[in-house]
Amino acid sequence: MKFSQVATTAAIFAGLTTAEIAYVTQTRGVTVGETATVATTVTVGATVTGGDQGQDQVQQSAAPEAGDIQQSAVPEADDIQQSAVPEAEPTADADGGNGIAITEVFTTTIMGQEIVYSGVYYSYGEEHTYGDVQVQTLTIGGGGFPSDDQYPTTEVSAEASPSAVTTSSAVATPDAKVPDSTKDASQPAATTASGSSSGSNDFSGVKDTQFAQQILDAHNKKRARHGVPDLTWDATVYEYAQKFADQYSCSGNLQHSGGKYGENLAVGYADGAAALQAWYEEAGKDGLSYSYGSSSVYNHFTQVVWKSTTKLGCAYKDCRAQNWGLYVVCSYDPAGNVMGTDPKTGKSYMAENVLRPQ
């Protein structure tokens, strides 16, 4: 099996079973407000469906100088996000042969940023040959809320291969002061948790009202399971999401807007409900695979069910011509994923707002 890495020396891994996967762990030296320098370690790790672990074949690139490094943990097998790929016709690979092109996606988190890796390999029965694996370079820090006519652009190191990927944002820092809009994070909104169709919402000015209704209903169905109030559709929040979606390049790479709202992103999905389901399933299909009350993991799931968030606006850009499906942006007001402790209760905002399924 051959594996190559953008901006990294190509590594040859021989004799691996079809059950093994190559893990990529990114190491970065960070300067706030600037793009981080990147070094990448490629290893062969745990199996996915059985077989022996490949422990001998390792290729490592030069790492940043000590003191400037934030090292992410190599993902466990359960942390691999693998895109569902339909049956494919034989495709000519880089060597001129015919194989079934299969795309894999997995992620890791560095400095609170979710880094997405995707790669294509060609299946010839027992043999799997890896093609290019693309890596994002994200910008850490810097930037405030963009004005109406100036929205940030996506900055990445390379184009990725078509797959379904997602990313989410968090706000504040540990023990940070919470903005006024979220200072009463533990207080329920005036609405009740019904999970029913949100037919009373005003979708005036929305490009695709069917998409808006579908993704709002999908959110509220999940929130009802956790006993938290329904979200309502908000025109201002929607306009923000739509403007940010409109500037997307359909590259397959994801970067957050850096604005004042909570934000979940996804690309490669057929519709909004599918993207929402992927976000929610970070806690398992039933929402039970999460350490409620003790976890410090902020992700798409926690923003979806965040109790004190009351308003939603979601939009998309059609990237099907680039084989990327829909690029989905959901903005949340007030923002969820607030880090720190509520001074009134002494509890973490996470514990107050991410509740167990009922």
UniProtKB/Swiss-Prot annotation:
Residues 48-98, 144-203 are annotated as: Disordered. Belongs to the CRISP family. This is Secreted protein RBT4. Residues 216-332 form the SCP domain. One of its GO terms (molecular function) is cholesterol binding. Residues 1-19 form the signal peptide. PROSITE patterns: CRISP_2.
